[in-house]
């Protein structure tokens, strides 16, 4: 699972996923990419299951890039605990994905295989998505 080795603060403020992405908007490394069309938090478990789905379809010649990383820790208080007395303990790590962010990229495989691999990966994520080509500007 992906998670940071060290963080400056254990329990950060919540980061909003509203609005459009500023960076990470184009396919930079591969030939095809999986782009988010709305914002959401993507957990490290979702990223891992999408990675496995892509790597099953890639084979030995294909290459994959994961362009998101779960930097944000989400906290939760235990069940049946009264309000107050501080913030809860960190429960899971999430990546903040805004609309227009390219999350995964693949290369060195035929287009049909790339589309099925990215489709299988997209179905594992809690965000709406579309498949984009390198050099293609995706308008919302």
Curated annotation (Swiss-Prot):
UniProt GO BP: translation
The keyword Ribosomal protein is assigned to this record: yes
Keywords assigned: Ribonucleoprotein, Ribosomal protein, RNA-binding, rRNA-binding, tRNA-binding
InterPro entries: Ribosomal_uL16 (IPR047873), Ribosomal_uL16_bact-type (IPR000114), Ribosomal_uL16_CS (IPR020798), Ribosomal_uL16_dom (IPR016180), Ribosomal_uL16_sf (IPR036920)
Coiled-coil residues: none
PROSITE patterns per record: RIBOSOMAL_L16_1, RIBOSOMAL_L16_2
Cellular-component GO terms for this entry: cytosolic large ribosomal subunit
GO MF annotations in UniProt: rRNA binding; structural constituent of ribosome; tRNA binding
Keyword rRNA-binding: yes
Function: Binds 23S rRNA and is also seen to make contacts with the A and possibly P site tRNAs.
Summary of subunit composition and partner proteins: Part of the 50S ribosomal subunit.
Family: Belongs to the universal ribosomal protein uL16 family.
Record PANTHER family: 50S/60S RIBOSOMAL PROTEIN L16, LARGE RIBOSOMAL SUBUNIT PROTEIN UL16M
Protein name: Large ribosomal subunit protein uL16
Lineage, opening ranks: Bacteria, Bacillati, Mycoplasmatota, Mycoplasmoidales, Mycoplasmoidaceae
